[in-house]
Curated annotation (Swiss-Prot):
It catalyses: uridine(13) in tRNA = pseudouridine(13) in tRNA. Gene3D superfamilies: 1.10.1510.30, 3.30.70.3160, TruD, catalytic domain. It comes from Pyrococcus horikoshii (strain ATCC 700860 / DSM 12428 / JCM 9974 / NBRC 100139 / OT-3). The keyword Isomerase applies. Belongs to the pseudouridine synthase TruD family. InterPro entries: PsdUridine_synth_cat_dom_sf, PsdUridine_synth_TruD, PsdUridine_synth_TruD_CS, PsdUridine_synth_TruD_insert, TruD_catalytic. Its EC number is 5.4.99.27. CDD domains: PSTD1. GO terms for molecular function: RNA binding; tRNA pseudouridine(13) synthase activity. This is Probable tRNA pseudouridine synthase D. The keyword Transcription does not apply.
């Protein structure tokens, strides 16, 4: 049984959670993407608003491309959205083709204008409208009061980062980082999920290591697993088998392990009693503009600028950051630096490991704010249900806000 990578992470608030269930129905989790207005200045690509339900973003885009007879790479998008949800996001296509008449179940497309091609990351964030069912709503005010006093919610990466139904991405990432390609292949190919199609074939591969049998038994939709198996049969090298995968897939594994370490850093900081909304000497802070953290604009906190920086944090113009470990990330000093070193040491990896990765897997790293400060946060209770509405910057998980509020057992 795979361990939940979020299970042992500390909560920032000590107030009991409201409990409850999310995503009982797709309509319980509504996501609306926000992109910069500048996208619509100039540019000749057609921009559509894609509404989907029970579709992964990539699967929906591939289906749209198939229906109009083009390669899916011709359709641009800014961010991936949850599958078990109702989501609204923008897509671009740089040719004169009308998508509004494309008929796909649970997918609608509306033309909104002309603009520049969309690329991954080219969004400001997302509005969320989320229903949590069967809660104890009277506990909510205390949690929100305490979260406000402590500056917000812990900015943990959500379970989506590690694999929602089969949380192996971070384990594979660590093994790749250590150059243990055979073990990484065993985890990626062999670890079963939670009652997923293909689980029996995975288990059999883990027991037998029989590549030919796996190619017979692995379902066709496990295309990356099958591609690796074919490459191994051809080369006898698990390293070359991984490197045959598309770079975005390889990056998922490394990003997942970076995210796992970042989560451990936040949890350790809470555990040791250090604030997330107040800088310590040696911290690195990120600038904030109009509520959006600018993760590439950072500066170091020293004894001499400590009061000035904490004033900026109180005014909402800066936030304390944590490490996204990589070959050129900016390391903290002082107590925060000690915590970073301990996280790496306890995980059994070093910055050298990041530098030695094959080029397609190499990640520079960076900094990420420790807190989530939802904008326009509102809620209302409807019987035992609570309906939440808020905006989050890109790369921030609504499920991490809800985790602190619900405190799942």
């Amino acid at each position: 049984m795979l361990e939940d990578p979020l299970r042992n992470l500390r909560y920032l608030t000590s107030s009991p959670g409201i409990g409850g269930k999310i995503k009982v129905y797709p309509e319980d989790f509504i996501v609306k993407e926000v992109i910069p207005k500048s996208i619509f200045r100039g540019g000749r690509c057609r921009i559509y608003l894609l509404k989907k339900k029970n579709w992964e973003t990539m699967a929906a885009i591939k289906e749209i491309a198939k229906r109009i007879g083009i390669h899916y790479s011709e359709i641009g998008f800014a961010g991936t959205k949850d599958r078990h949800a109702v989501t609204y996001q923008y897509i671009s296509i740089c040719r004169e083709v009308d998508l509004e008449n494309v008929a796909i179940k649970d997918v609608t497309l509306r033309f909104v204008g002309y603009g520049r091609p969309l690329k991954l990351g080219l969004l400001l964030g997302n509005f969320f409208k989320i229903r949590v069912r069967d809660t104890t709503p009277e506990l909510l005010p205390n949690i929100l009061k305490e979260a406000k006093e402590k500056g917000g919610f812990p900015n943990y990466f959500g379970i989506q980062r590690f694999g929602e139904k089969r949380s192996v991405n971070h384990i594979v990432g660590k093994l790749l980082l250590l150059g243990k390609y055979e073990e990484a292949a065993e985890v990626f190919l062999g670890y079963p999920g939670n009652g997923m199609e293909g689980d029996e074939a995975r288990k059999k591969f883990l027991e037998t290591k029989n590549v030919d049998l796996a190619l017979e038994e692995f379902p066709k939709f496990l295309r990356y697993e099958r591609a690796m198996l074919y490459k191994y049969r051809e080369t006898g090298s698990w390293k070359r088998s991984f490197l045959a995968l598309p770079r975005p897939i390889l990056r998922i594994f490394i990003h997942a392990f970076q995210s796992y370490l970042f989560n451990l850093y936040i949890s350790r900081r809470i555990e040791e009693g250090f604030p997330l909304n107040e800088a310590l000497p040696g911290d690195i802070v990120v600038q904030v503009k109009k509520g959006i953290p600018l993760r590439d604009r950072t500066y170091r906190v020293t004894e001499s600028n400590l009061d000035f920086v904490n004033e900026k944090i109180m005014q909402g113009e800066a936030m304390v950051s944590g490490p996204i470990f990589g070959y050129s990330y900016r390391r903290s000093h002082g107590i925060p630096g000690r915590l970073e070193d301990e996280i790496l040491e306890e995980a059994g990896v070093s910055l050298e490991n990041f530098k030695r990765l094959p080029k397609p897997m190499r990640e520079p790293g960076g900094r990420r704010e420790l807190l989530i400060k939802p904008r326009g946060f509102r809620y209302k209770t409807e019987g035992r249900d609570v309906l939440f509405k808020f905006f989050l910057p890109k790369g921030v998980y609504a499920t991490s806000v809800l985790r602190e509020i619900i405190k799942p057992t």
